[in-house]
């Protein structure tokens, strides 16, 4: 077994090319040959850890596949910052919407046709920007609570640690299923994902 490598999904499916390709049905032999070469190249790069950076670039996909059992849709219109902060969330029409304030959440619910007249229950959630990207957890070995906390806490600036500690001290009785939104850098911007 090759272990957990980029582009190999938990069901064994191998993604070796972009989604937007056009195949010439008049060349089936060439398509199969090229497919096999690309699959072997993908596996070789993964085994030799040459394409581990792809875990970071496609972090959200691996995160989603690993946590599909929770099936929570999160919609966000807020622009992530470099500071730990409390933001707002509400569950509307089976989706969780996050933003900086309640009015922005209502606007998002209307704009995305989730609800015309939402009357949600608003709650705080914590936004945490990481300094360096994490690699996703293996499909069969999702992080436990203490491991996840350690990965986050060890990967934020000193100022953000202080801010996070202030928030946690103030809200020390946060319920079990509170939402934490994490951002982490990648070459084309950031990845944004949530943890309940």
Residue locations for each model-derived region?
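N-terminal ligand-binding/catalytic initiation module
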Residues: 1-196
């Amino acid at each position: 077994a090759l272990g957990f490598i980029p582009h190999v999904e938990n069901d064994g499916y191998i993604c070796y090319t972009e989604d937007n390709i056009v195949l010439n049905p008049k060349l089936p032999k060439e398509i199969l040959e090229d497919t096999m070469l690309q699959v072997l190249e993908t596996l070789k790069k993964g085994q030799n850890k040459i394409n581990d950076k792809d875990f970071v670039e496609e972090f959200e996909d691996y995160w989603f596949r690993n946590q599909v059992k929770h099936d929570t849709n999160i919609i966000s219109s807020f622009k992530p910052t470099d500071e730990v902060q409390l933001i707002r969330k509400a569950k509307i029409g089976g989706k969780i919407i996050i933003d900086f304030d309640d009015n922005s959440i209502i606007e998002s619910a209307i704009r995305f046709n989730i609800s015309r007249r939402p009357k949600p229950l608003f709650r705080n959630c914590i936004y945490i920007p990481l300094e360096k990207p994490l690699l996703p957890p293996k499909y069969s070995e999702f992080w436990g609570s203490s491991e996840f906390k350690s990965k986050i806490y060890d990967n934020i600036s000193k100022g953000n640690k202080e801010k996070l500690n202030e928030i946690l001290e103030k809200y020390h009785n946060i319920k079990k299923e509170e939402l934490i939104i994490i951002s982490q850098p990648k070459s084309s911007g950031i990845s944004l994902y949530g943890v309940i």
